[in-house]
Amino acid sequence: MQLSNNFLWGGATADFQFEGAYQEDGRGLSTHDYETDGSVQHPRCNTFKTADGQFGELPSSFFAPDPLPDGAEPCLYEDRYYPSHKAVDHYHRYKEDIALLAGMGMNVYRFSICWSRIFPTGDELEPNEAG
């Protein structure tokens, strides 16, 4: 099959799955940063610390909010793996990644940026340009 010369061939990426660099250039934390890895046998979880200092985790749900217990705050555990923290490190390797896409003949690329890169706490009046 012959494609026309103006055919757009491309790809797309999502910040959580691709970006990495979760604490660089003033980026704030988002709910996905507290989501662990998982498998069929052990689903992804959101980790937290209760008001009385107890650590806990609840299974993550893509389609519903993940409410934490009253008074609990999201918390990162040193012994857990959080995929979004490094991901595939597109934040540092974007030039190489785009060159790879171009090398495959792609001529368009759609990507998303984590909102907490631009507005680290969500309360800023001006965007974080470094993010």
Language model regions located:
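Non-catalytic accessory regions flanking glycosidase/transglycosidase catalytic cores in CAZymes
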Residues: 1-131
